[in-house]
């Protein structure tokens, strides 16, 4: 007879700093040992910007979850870590000064990675960020991760519709079936040029459109989010990937975020699917 004991787990990518107390208590009751909060996205708190966010905004996106993480640990009894990076889902000004803050932030024991970040054709608030400019900012973050020898969480974009969000989006015309691979190729060209060790790289939001490429053409870890109702990946999908390819390099995460529907039990359900 299979054991029904709760299996501890780590949620390697989430945005739960925007969640209420009760949601944290629910997550804490599922056996979670630790979470890694990805900071840098203003939409987590349902903010609407009329002007391009600047250095003070970015500092707040990062420092608020860093401060919150210690309180959350004391209240909910599991470890809370943070990754910091400039997300291209929101255009920002003064990004050079923002990047200068990262080395000092990474000295904090609860800040463990750069990211999530990755070239994205879609920006919130209709404030388009040209791809060529994104490449420059992205490369600087990759170089920083290599220099500091810290994990790098790579965001791969998902096709989006304005109705799924709180405000107008600046959108892309790349076909859905080519979407992730097209922008992942741009990211990987820069990552390989800089020489970032793939063992320090997590390629996140992986789905069937890029799975084979990531498995065969990289040595990176493979992040699959199972907790958002907006995504097509779910506990059953993760279990299917494990059955087809084995567990090596695979990382499950919730990618919970406050502006879409979420399944707070998604990772425990994934563990059950794997039994």
How would you name each of these model-derived features?
Residues 39-40, 226-227, 254-256:
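Short secondary-structure boundary segments
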Residues 182, 236, 262-265, 269:
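Conserved active-site and cofactor/substrate-binding residues in soluble primary-metabolism enzymes
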Residues 45-48, 213, 231-239, 261:
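Short, charged, surface-exposed secondary-structure boundary motifs
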Residues 219-233:
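His/Asp/Glu-enriched short active-site or ligand-binding loop at hydrolase and phosphoryl-transfer sites
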Residues 245-264:
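Short acidic/histidine-rich active-site segments
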Residues 144, 267-275:
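Mid-to-C-terminal alpha-helical segments outside catalytic/metal-binding sites
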Residues 1-174, 182-190, 198-209, 214-217, ...:
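Mid-domain alpha/beta scaffold segments of enzyme catalytic cores
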